[in-house]
């Protein structure tokens, strides 16, 4: 089994992206699955192109993209991605699409087909703060999650795919009072446990993971 895991480069004025740094720390074999790592640019469209090139090259069974969500308290597997780019800031090449569909022929939304609740349980059971997230935003993270699931729906029907957001690391919040963070070691451990849960669970578990609002 092959797992392709991607991490974004830094963006938005940050000098580091914990998503990419944590991806670099993950073991290359988890529960017998080969883990292949890929750095992707925080750039609309180019990020997706790079992922599809790698899919064509290695033919993975699972694709997991990792992104930074500053302000979150834990590691958060995403439930759904929407067909909308609405960038609050520019990407790393100056693009700032506003209210633009990612794919004109795509569905309004695509749901992750990863066992997101099993992933959360595996992390929490091992002391890593985690919860299901119901929004991936409207920046490049959502763009990538939606785009990969679009490709799965249209072309790579046997691939399981989804997205995980991770918090800031402590060095990023030195000048951001009252902003949560998590050590890079805990983030990397959370990603490793998530991959373990994906490899061991073809179907998700039935447990509460929703939110009131």
UniProtKB/Swiss-Prot annotation:
Domain of life (superkingdom): Bacteria
Major location (coarse): cytoplasm
Cysteine pairs bridged by disulfides in the record: none
Active site: 78, 141, 165
The keyword Hydrolase is assigned to this record: yes
Keyword terms of this UniProt record: Cytoplasm, Hydrolase, Protease, Thiol protease
One GO BP: proteolysis
Cellular localization per UniProt: Cytoplasm
Record-level GO cellular component terms: cytosol
UniProt-listed Pfam families: Peptidase_C15
A single MF term (Gene Ontology): pyroglutamyl-peptidase activity
Enzyme Commission designation: 3.4.19.3
Subunit structure: Homotetramer.
Family indicated by similarity: Belongs to the peptidase C15 family.
Function summary: Removes 5-oxoproline from various penultimate amino acid residues except L-proline.
UniProt protein name: Pyrrolidone-carboxylate peptidase
């Amino acid at each position: 089994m092959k797992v392709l895991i991607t991490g974004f480069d830094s963006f938005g004025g940050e000098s580091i992206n914990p998503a990419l740094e944590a991806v670099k720390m993950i073991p290359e074999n988890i529960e017998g699955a080969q883990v292949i790592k890929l750095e992707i640019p925080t750039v609309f469209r180019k990020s997706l192109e790079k992922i599809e090139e790698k899919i064509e090259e290695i033919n993975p069974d699972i694709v997991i993209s990792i992104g930074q969500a500053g302000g979150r308290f834990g590691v958060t597997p995403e439930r759904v991605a929407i067909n909308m780019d609405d960038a609050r800031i520019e990407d790393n090449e100056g693009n700032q699409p506003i209210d633009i569909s990612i794919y004109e022929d795509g569905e309004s939304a695509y749901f992750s087909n990863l066992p997101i609740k099993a992933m959360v349980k595996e992390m929490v059971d091992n002391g890593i703060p985690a919860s299901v997230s119901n929004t991936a935003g409207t920046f490049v993270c959502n763009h990538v999650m939606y785009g990969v699931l679009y490709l799965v729906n249209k072309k790579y029907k046997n691939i399981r795919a989804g997205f995980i957001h991770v918090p800031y690391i402590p060095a990023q919040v030195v000048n951001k009072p009252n902003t949560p963070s998590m050590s890079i070691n805990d983030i990397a451990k959370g990603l490793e446990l998530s991959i373990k849960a994906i490899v061991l669970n073809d179907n998700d578990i039935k447990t509460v993971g929703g939110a009131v609002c």
